[in-house]
């Protein structure tokens, strides 16, 4: 029996929500291990739509333990709002079903303000952040001045911790021409939110270790995509955390031996939100058609996603950096009806072939994709639940992707409906 890590194999928005929901039925515990509330996802269960950003997907299924690990940065005000919202939809969320790592870093209002100011300022590089304070909170974590969940339990020690945070932030704000943060006001806000958050706090690494030893199945739910990883993504157009599968261990407190099967999620084409390189981006009617059919707008932000052909070079790269065992290929039905489909199989850089995306930002801007043209199919794949339901050419497309990325397709999704899934290999049965 394997524990399973789910990671996005592109730039996020690959359809992880549906796959995680499908897998969570077989899991006992669902763990978020990185990021914050910057990456939303939608679940449709028994006709009811749930929109989550910070809460693990398991929270909407009864009998599951949901865990927010130490690798996540937690906006406590957003978390309570999200809990109340899904409670209003009839979902039971209590300390018996949700635990939060006591050593998780908190996102403070000053982090959101700084994020917004940086991104909207005329000077400097625009990264395309969601302006929710994720990056500044991680900066404080690495700078060893963060306020963590556990600190809320010691109100007498909070003033000194706030002073340490504000020594840095108020100096920065003065330099940026922003009003300084009032220490008493921040202390009051934290004291007010503490009793709502602390009942969920736990020593998560110990809890997960005990459950693992008891034979419980653990599903590690990644957010965003590996191409946004702060180390292995298209830097600096990345998020502020590690996203690759190894982070599941670091961000939950379990050793790497607890990770079993790594399932990467990839669309049958490619999308990206925000700034940054995108070698296969389409600026024509085909790109518009893909975006319209695929409803390519952000769950949290409503931002329009950039669309392009499937980039086998990039997915092959994430297969390697995340140690992906198998891929869940989603949105195959969006490609129905195209006479021909292109797949990027390599790059040219200054007239020379390259088999990966270089780390240099300047080199990334000069990359030219090399395409293989594959005949399309006129029949529909929407709603297919077996190989027999698929057009022959669609099967050839999937098989060619497997060859190019160096990993098998374990699951194939043919619509947003959770049952419209073709299973080749169950990750939990490794």
Curated annotation (Swiss-Prot):
Subcellular location as annotated: Cytoplasm
Cofactor note: Binds 1 Mg(2+) ion per subunit.
Sequence positions that bind GTP: 12-18, 40-42, 305, 331-333, 413-415
Assigned keywords, A-Z: Cytoplasm, GTP-binding, Ligase, Magnesium, Metal-binding, Nucleotide-binding, Purine biosynthesis
Swiss-Prot/TrEMBL catalytic activity: IMP + L-aspartate + GTP = N(6)-(1,2-dicarboxyethyl)-AMP + GDP + phosphate + 2 H(+)
Signal peptide: none
InterPro entries with a match to the protein in the record: Adenylosuccin_syn_GTP-bd, Adenylosuccin_syn_Lys_AS, Adenylosuccinate_synth_dom1, Adenylosuccinate_synth_dom2, Adenylosuccinate_synth_dom3, Adenylosuccinate_synthetase, P-loop_NTPase
Gene Ontology molecular-function annotations: adenylosuccinate synthase activity; GTP binding; magnesium ion binding
Residues where IMP binds: 13-16, 38-41, 130, 144, 224, 239, 303
Cofactor: Mg(2+)
Residues annotated as the enzyme's active site: 13, 41
Residues given in the record as substrate binding sites: 299-305
EC number: 6.3.4.4
Gene3D superfamilies for the chain: Adenylosuccinate Synthetase, subunit A, domain 1, Adenylosuccinate Synthetase, subunit A, domain 2, Adenylosuccinate Synthetase, subunit A, domain 3
Pathway(s): Purine metabolism; AMP biosynthesis via de novo pathway; AMP from IMP: step 1/2
Subunit and interaction comment: Homodimer.
Membership in a protein family: Belongs to the adenylosuccinate synthetase family.
Function: Plays an important role in the de novo pathway of purine nucleotide biosynthesis. Catalyzes the first committed step in the biosynthesis of AMP from IMP.
Annotated protein name in UniProt: Adenylosuccinate synthetase
Species: Methylobacterium radiotolerans (strain ATCC 27329 / DSM 1819 / JCM 2831 / NBRC 15690 / NCIMB 10815 / 0-1)
Originating gene: purA
């Amino acid at each position: 029996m394997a524990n399973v890590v789910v990671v996005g194999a592109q730039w996020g928005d690959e359809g992880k929500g549906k796959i995680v929901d499908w897998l969570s039925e077989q899991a006992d515990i669902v763990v978020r291990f990185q990021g914050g509330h910057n990456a939303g996802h939608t679940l449709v269960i028994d006709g009811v739509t749930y929109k989550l950003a910070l809460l693990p997907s398991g929270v909407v299924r009864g009998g599951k333990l949901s865990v927010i690990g130490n690798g996540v940065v937690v906006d406590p005000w957003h978390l309570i709002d999200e809990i109340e919202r899904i409670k209003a939809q009839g979902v039971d969320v209590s300390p018996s079903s949700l635990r939060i790592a006591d050593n998780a870093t908190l996102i403070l209002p000053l982090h959101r303000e700084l994020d917004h100011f940086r991104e909207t300022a005329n000077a400097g590089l625009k990264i395309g952040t969601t302006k929710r304070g994720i990056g500044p909170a991680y900066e404080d974590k690495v700078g060893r001045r963060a306020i963590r969940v556990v600190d809320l339990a010691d109100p007498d020690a909070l003033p000194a911790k706030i002073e340490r945070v504000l020594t840095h932030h108020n100096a920065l704000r003065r330099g940026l021409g922003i009003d300084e943060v009032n220490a008493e006001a921040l202390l009051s806000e934290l004291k007010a939110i503490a009793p709502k958050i602390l009942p969920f706090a736990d020593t998560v690494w110990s809890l997960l270790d005990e459950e693992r030893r008891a034979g419980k199945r653990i599903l590690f739910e990644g957010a965003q995509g590996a191409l946004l990883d702060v180390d292995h993504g298209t830097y600096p157009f990345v998020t502020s955390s590690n996203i690759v599968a190894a982070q599941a261990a670091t961000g939950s407190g379990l050793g790497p031996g607890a990770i079993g099967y790594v399932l990467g999620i990839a669309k049958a084409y490619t999308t990206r939100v925000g700034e940054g390189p995108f070698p296969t981006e389409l600026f024509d009617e085909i790109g518009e058609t893909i975006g319209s059919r695929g409803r390519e707008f952000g769950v949290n932000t409503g931002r329009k996603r950039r669309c392009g052909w499937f980039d086998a070079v990039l997915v092959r790269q994430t297969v390697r950096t995340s140690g992906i065992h198998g891929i869940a290929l989603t949105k195959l039905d969006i490609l129905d009806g195209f006479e021909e489909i292109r797949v990027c199989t390599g790059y040219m850089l200054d007239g020379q072939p390259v088999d990966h995306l270089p780390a240099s930002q300047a080199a990334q801007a000069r990359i030219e994709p090399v395409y293989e043209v594959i005949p399309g199919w006129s029949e529909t794949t929407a709603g297919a639940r077996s190989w027999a339901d698929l057009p022959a050419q669609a099967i050839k497309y999937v098989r060619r992707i497997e060859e190019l990325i160096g990993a098998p397709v374990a699951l194939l999704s043919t619509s947003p409906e959770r049952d419209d899934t073709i299973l080749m290999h169950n990750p939990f049965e490794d």
